[in-house]
Amino acid sequence: MLIRIVRRLTLDEVKSKIKQFEEEHDTTFDDFEELFLSRRLDRSRVGKYFEWASLVHAYRGYVEGGELDYIIEETRELSPEQTALLTPKRLELLYSLASLQAESINKLAQKTKRNVKNVYYDLKTLQRLGLVVFRRRGRRNIIPETLIEEITLVIR
């Protein structure tokens, strides 16, 4: 089964992609941008410039304001085993996580009227599929977050 996902990138993913661009082009973004602005950049690399620029601007926005906003669309092929993990309860939990403000796994379990242990297990499964991340706040509080903006299952 194919799955089409529109999601936000994590900070680590943005940093990694910026580093990949620097290694691939053997230069910094500022130098690459100078080539673009002075019209000395090869036409085949213009698309790369815009992608790199949007990553750098998103990262700089994060540094200045603490909010990272970079959205990508990707298509993944799920194995039959992975497809089986997308149960109705887990998809419902993913939807609830996106629409409810949950300060912890306990609060999410309360809001969805489910057992905390089952919610935690389902969140860990969704994390392995790359649909959920956990953010630690304080010493004990773990906050589940979804990076998913949109998900489409393509059955073929």
Predicted regions and their residues:
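Short, cationic-aromatic polyanion-contact patches
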Residues: 79-88, 104, 136-156
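Residues within the DNA-recognition helix of helix-turn-helix
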Residues: 122
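Short alpha-helical segments that sit at the start of domains
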Residues: 64-92
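DNA-contacting interfaces and partner/effector-binding or oligomerization modules
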Residues: 1-43, 48
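A short, conserved structural fragment
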Residues: 128-137
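A short acidic, leucine-rich amphipathic alpha-helix
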Residues: 107-113, 126
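Short amphipathic alpha-helical interface segments
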Residues: 88-102
